[in-house]
A protein has these predicted regions:
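Conserved Class I SAM-dependent methyltransferase catalytic core
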Residues: 141-199
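A short acidic, Gly/Pro-enriched loop at the edge of an enzyme's catalytic core
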Residues: 99-110
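Mobile active-site "lid"/loop adjacent to the S-adenosyl-L-methionine
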Residues: 114-143
Length: 234
């Protein structure tokens, strides 16, 4: 009997289930998971939680985690995965766009692996949720800029924002944007990844944005660095 496929994803002793309409964690989320230093007293915000990957991993250490997502199916999936992994009592799942569901709240740590694939202007095929999940606007910064703009009002003194960023969006640009938001920035981690398949059909646009020449070609294959950028409140 036909039905929607269920995907299982295992990471560091945690189990994540997702139906076909919710994406499993990809390289950026895994990179961020390896570099998020969560403290026992932390109250954490997971922006765009998806299957709940980052929030659930953080909840194993943190005092409390709030996870938001604009997609109802993702919120329900993440809530189910929190129960599956025994951390539901430490988590609060909220439906809404980025910070909208946490108005007036502040956090010790904010985690984000947002859409950041540059999308050519005039694209009219973004009804596919899989494409929307990667849509960073014409420069790749559409969602990242919103996260940085509003981060200061949601960070406690000394609080940290950790977000992923393709190097072709600009390493210096990323740090300058963090500073412009009134935060102190640094590169937490970096890793070389095969060039994303979704980026190949928009390669000319991406190459035009790569002011720092970060895209590499080795043995006929393209590679790009993925960064974890830190931003700390005063």
């Amino acid at each position: 009997m036909a039905g929607s496929a269920t995907h299982l994803f295992l990471y560091d002793g945690a189990v994540f289930k997702a139906e076909a309409d919710v994406m499993i964690p990809k390289r950026g989320s895994i990179l961020l998971a390896r570099h998020m230093a969560v403290r026992p007293a932390d109250v954490v915000l997971d922006l765009g939680t998806g299957v709940g990957f980052l929030g659930i991993l953080a909840a194993r250490t943190a005092r409390r985690v709030v996870a938001t997502d604009v997609v109802p199916a993702s919120v329900e999936c993440a809530r189910a995965n929190a129960i599956l992994n025994g951390v539901a009592h430490k988590m609060d799942f909220r439906l809404g766009d980025l910070y909208a569901p946490v108005s007036g709240m502040t956090f010790d740590l904010i985690l984000a692996n947002p859409p950041q694939m540059p999308t050519p202007p005039g694209r009219d095929d973004l009804k596919d949720p899989r494409l929307l999940a990667d849509d960073g606007g014409p420069t790749g910064w559409a969602t990242l800029d919103r996260i940085l703009r509003d981060a200061p009002e949601h960070l406690r003194p000394g609080g940290r924002l950790l977000f992923t960023c393709f190097a072709f969006l600009g390493v210096r640009r990323a740090l300058a944007k963090v500073e412009a938001a009134g935060l102190q920035g640094w590169i937490v981690g970096r890793e070389l990844h095969p060039f994303p398949r979704i980026g190949l059909e928009r390669f000319d646009l991406i190459r035009s944005l790569d002011d720092e020449g970060t895209i590499r070609e080795e043995h006929g294959r393209l590679f790009v660095e993925r960064l974890v950028v830190g931003a700390a409140a005063p």
